[in-house]
Amino acid sequence: MTLVRTALALLALYVCVHAQKLTPLATRPDWASLEKFQGTISKEEFNRLLTQVYAPGGAWQEYFTIAEDHATVATGEGEPPFRLEFAPDAANAKPVPRYWQPRNSLRGLRIALDPGHLGGEWAKMEERWFQIGNNKPVTEGDMVLYVAKLLKSELERRGASVSLTRSSSKPATNLRPDKLKGPAVRSLRDQGRSVNPASLKSEAERLFYRTAEIRARAKKVNGQLKPDLVLALHFNAESWGNPARPTLTGLNHLHLLVSGCYSARELSYEDQRYDLMAKLLNRSYDKEVAVSRAVAQSMARATRLPPYNYTGDSAINVGGSPYVWARNLLANRLFECPVVYLEPYVMNNKEVHDRVQLGDYSGRRNINGIPRESIYREYVRGVVEGLEAYYNR
């Protein structure tokens, strides 16, 4: 009898865990929170956003249905789907309930700057750190924080209200890798990877600096800052090989990301289906694309960089700009407002590395025969000019 009870308990635990297929550190979605969106979107608009932006290539078909007057999306296993009633047409749609406002001026615009990664003592763990010989280390987290502080000043001078998701290298999350070993084991098994001391350490660290940290920032953005726009600031990189002996590359490029392009595998997770619905229904996409297109144009002009081109199926080109792509990332998925996600400069490009060694400076210096601002001020100018072009048009 004891063995039977034990077997039944294990079976119940398996069924519970299986029914709640969630990505690492996610909580069960509150599907009822989407009820406020009933009647706020037409069938045509929902179909466009779902099938062309968020789940292209038929990725949506296993989990969503679209009928004449409603759509459904699968929730937890064994539970009824969430049903969304469509508006009769766009003209008769109810107002969209959301915290962000589609303002048309930089003055009064609420902007949250999200300097990617952490930097500081965490930079090596994040693998966003490299050093050539005795030169100054290149640390993305510290570099984008410097950009954010310069950018904050410039945007505030133009009347925007600006906040930062972090103002130091201190993590927003209270979790640390040693508290994430259980989730790390589950994550490794979900990926079909072996669990050993090295993989467990690496995955627990990844869940700390990427997953837990981004989720903590999203909680701050959505619950406290409630901006009209998030600017996610990053530098890009190509593989630099052996961390002990990194190599420089001749490649250098620019691209910007908006939320979209979920795969069928990603949509097998209940929380990702919920996140897609929340993002789609608050109508971030068109604003994200429009602002990203304007910023991409000014960044391309400021940086003189060609567009990066995705060759796989993890991203789709959108907005009529070769620089703007839709991709499903945790940050642009969880922030419940338009997000412009910037990826300029390849950090381990030789010229970029040399410019980082120069640090910040006023005026211009000769860089390969061209007078250039510091890489930080060039970044800031590209962003500011793009925002001015869009919001003050």
Q: Language-model features: where?
A:
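Sec-dependent signal peptide recognition
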Residues: T2-A9
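Catalytic-site microenvironment of enzymes
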Residues: T6, A19-R393
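Hydrophobic h-region of N-terminal signal peptides that target proteins for export
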Residues: L10-A19
